[in-house]
UniProtKB/Swiss-Prot annotation:
Assembly with partners or alone: Part of the 30S ribosomal subunit. Forms a tight complex with proteins S10 and S14.
HAMAP family assigned to the protein according to its UniProt record, in alphabetical order: Ribosomal_uS3_B
Provenance organism: Synechococcus sp. (strain CC9311)
GO biological process: translation
Compositionally biased tracts (Basic and acidic residues): 234-243
Protein name per the record: Small ribosomal subunit protein uS3
Keyword Lipid metabolism among UniProt keywords: no
Span of domain KH type-2: 39-110
Gene name as annotated: rpsC
Alphabetical list of Pfam families matching this protein: KH_2, Ribosomal_S3_C
Keyword Ribosomal protein belongs to the record: yes
Role description: Binds the lower part of the 30S subunit head. Binds mRNA in the 70S ribosome, positioning it for translation.
MF-aspect GO terms: mRNA binding; rRNA binding; structural constituent of ribosome
């Protein structure tokens, strides 16, 4: 069953958290859920080059809080925070309420090559550039190993290298325990549009196990990490709507 069910949905409340954190009545719940979906689609479409791996949405009364986990926070923030204002106005336009209070937090992803969504996005970009899929997968595995992940599985489906018959190819390095509930599995999917059709990409990243004492297994740092030692991840918190 662990190989069939969605890894994130299986571990909600254990090692994973909900992407939308709010409560609503049964009447307003569908509208708010669709609103969250529109916000996420708008952000990924407009800021596709910012490397946004996750969008967390929280609601408090009439205030909307959006947290963006990105590999390139400078693209979102812009000069003197101008990008935040553009993003806020875009979200207000998407929800159809220009008076809605929108608070935006931008958090930099600490290890880019250990993030499943960013790895899937990298693979999709390479495949769209007509790079051979085996070479692309090998390069993605090497990047993830340098980032210090404990296990990785990549699956690509479709007309690989322009073949007449679609097929599925996958590779796995290290441990990817899908049946272990305490295992922190980062899972993401992506679609690559090529001249031969679309290719489906799935990425599983095993980052460690959450132990019973709420401490997490240490992940060894690669011998050649991409990030410089001692550099702290950036975080930008929007407080312009407060007061």
């Amino acid at each position: 069953m662990g190989h069939k069910i969605h890894p994130t949905g299986l571990r909600l409340g254990i090692t994973q958290e909900h992407r939308s954190r709010w409560y609503a009545s049964s009447k307003s719940y569908p509208a708010l859920l669709q609103e969250d979906d529109r916000i996420r689609k708008f952000i990924h479409k407009k800021y596709g080059s910012a490397g946004i791996s996750d969008v967390l949405i929280a609601r408090k009364a009439d205030q909307l809080e959006v947290e963006l986990k990105t590999a390139r926070p400078g693209v979102l923030v812009g000069r003197q925070g101008s990008g935040i204002e553009d993003l806020r106005s875009g979200i207000q336009k998407t929800v159809g309420d220009s008076s809605r209070q929108v608070r935006i937090n931008v958090v930099e992803v600490e290890r880019v090559d250990a993030d499943a969504f960013l790895l899937a996005e990298y693979i999709a970009q390479q495949l769209e550039k007509r790079v051979a899929f085996r070479r692309t997968i090998r390069m993605a595995v090497q990047r993830a190993q340098r980032a210090g992940v404990l296990g990785l599985k990549i699956q690509v489906s479709g007309r690989l290298n322009g073949a007449e018959i679609a097929r599925t190819e996958w590779t796995r390095e290290g441990r990817v325990p899908l049946h272990t509930l305490r295992a922190e599995i980062d899972y993401a999917t992506k679609v690559a549009s090529t001249t031969y059709g679309v290719l489906g990409i799935k990425v599983w990243v095993f980052k460690g196990e959450v132990l019973s004492d709420d401490s997490q297994q240490q992940i060894p740092v690669g011998a050649n990490p991409r990030r410089r030692a001692g550099r702290r991840p950036q975080q930008f918190e929007d407080r312009s709507n407060e007061g």
